From Swiss-Prot:
Keywords recorded for this protein, A-Z: ATP-binding, Cytoplasm, DNA damage, DNA repair, DNA replication, DNA-binding, Nucleotide-binding, SOS response
InterPro entries recorded: DNA-binding_RecF (IPR001238), DNA-binding_RecF_CS (IPR018078), P-loop_NTPase (IPR027417), RecF/RecN/SMC_N (IPR003395), RecF_2 (IPR042174)
Gene designation per UniProt: recF
Residues forming coiled coils: none
Name by which UniProt lists this protein: DNA replication and repair protein RecF
UniProt GO molecular function: ATP binding; single-stranded DNA binding
Length: 375
């Protein structure tokens, strides 16, 4: 699949923009704070209906405006689709072929993207929240039902945490309501956990050989899911629910004392092992970056295996963060088969056949000054 054009209105520092793209490689060049990352973000938001940079949708709307809009044309193997996302203070509305979607979960997954930005290099050594977000965003693209379960879980979690804070003063009168929220949380949480296990099993199958290739056969990568309760991938849904129920009973008084939910998918984490050593703790910076790159390349292949089309790859100022070897491995892997967007302050020092065939877009202060095809 590839995006052939995009239109922005009141998005970040763009008042109005219409731009067409090549189906292979597009290089967006500009100095810092000119709008190249905003353009890249707009493509991501068009696909995912949320930003990878902020959870506050208001930040996506141009200063002093009431709404922002992103439109795009997506070319898939057997169809052409128009996508539209309208952002206002009241929320977001999405359209497919001019038809408004009742739920964003019906919209997300139509256009698949993989974002690789400098912050993704922190996927390995960053906080558990970064790794959970990675899971949620990638799983949501190939399993819309996961997004539904996740949104329901988060709603119940918010209500339950509010009740737990209230119960810190007097818990006697609210225990029945707490039990109701607990059962709802278990129902959605168990399904989320099961989907995560399935996804990571597939991701492992792709990431391990990719990592082996990048490391020239010297390293073996293993991805391990670390749940907050004693469950395993081999358990069925009913057994997972049973373990959750028992675990919630055992931490009930602690949760009331702390005023927050102490177990569940929102507390889980991932660990990465290279040659049986925890790369988060003992890995070199090179091993951590190879692991992050392996995960991103595995995402591309996993999405292809599920939807039978390659996703759109967004490389936001990340090439300069990779050494020549990893840079070349990345570009060699995607060459000719994945529509790719690259942002950079300059193409100097990046010598690769892929970029020589690219369409180049120069961005200055929220406007596209010129577009040329590199010779």
């Amino acid at each position: 699949m590839f995006i052939s054009e995009i239109q922005l209105k009141n998005y970040r520092n763009y008042e109005k923009l219409e731009l067409s793209f090549e189906d292979k490689v597009n290089v967006i060049i500009g100095e810092n704070a000119q709008g190249k990352t905003n353009l890249m973000e707009a493509i991501y938001v068009l696909a995912m209906a949320k930003s990878h940079r902020t959870s506050n949708d208001r930040e996506l709307i141009r200063w002093d405006e009431d709404f922002g809009q992103i439109k795009g044309k997506l070319q898939k193997r057997n169809s052409s689709l128009s996508l539209e996302l309208n952002i206002s203070k009241k929320g977001k509305k999405a359209k497919l072929n001019q038809l408004e979607q009742q739920k964003l979960s019906q919209y997300i997954g139509v256009m698949n993207v993989v974002m690789f930005a400098p912050e993704d290099l922190n996927l390995v050594k960053g906080s558990p929240q970064v790794r959970r977000r990675f899971l949620d965003m990638e799983l949501g693209q190939i399993a819309p039902v996961y997004l539904y379960e996740l949104s329901q879980y988060q709603k119940v979690l918010t209500q339950r945490n509010h009740l737990l804070k209230k119960m810190q003063g007097n818990s006697k009168n609210e225990e029945t309501m707490l039990d109701v929220f607990t059962l709802q949380l278990i129902e959605h949480g168990a399904k989320i956990l099961q989907k995560r296990f399935e996804f990571l099993h597939l991701l492992q199958e792709w990431a391990a050989p990719i990592h082996r290739g990048i490391s020239r056969g010297l390293e073996e990568l293993e991805i391990v899911y670390k749940p907050s309760v004693d469950v395993s991938e081999s358990m069925d849904l009913s057994k997972i629910k049973e373990v959750y129920y028992e675990s919630f009973q055992s931490v009930k008084q602690r949760e009331i004392f702390r005023g927050t939910t102490l177990i569940g998918p929102h507390r889980d984490d991932l660990q990465f092992f290279v040659n049986s050593k925890n790369v988060q703790v003992f890995g070199s910076q090179g091993q951590q970056r190879t692991t992050a790159l392996s995960l991103k390349l595995a995402e591309i292949e996993l999405i292809y295996s599920e939807v039978k089309e390659y996703p759109i790859l967004l490389l936001d100022d990340v090439l300069s963060e990779l050494d020549d070897y990893r840079q070349s491995h990345l570009l060699n892997t995607i060459q000719g088969k994945v529509q790719t967007f690259v942002t950079t302050t300059s193409v100097d020092g990046i010598e690769h056949e892929t970029l020589k065939e690219a369409k180049t877009i120069h961005v200055t202060n929220g406007t596209v000054d010129c577009e040329i095809d590199r010779e």
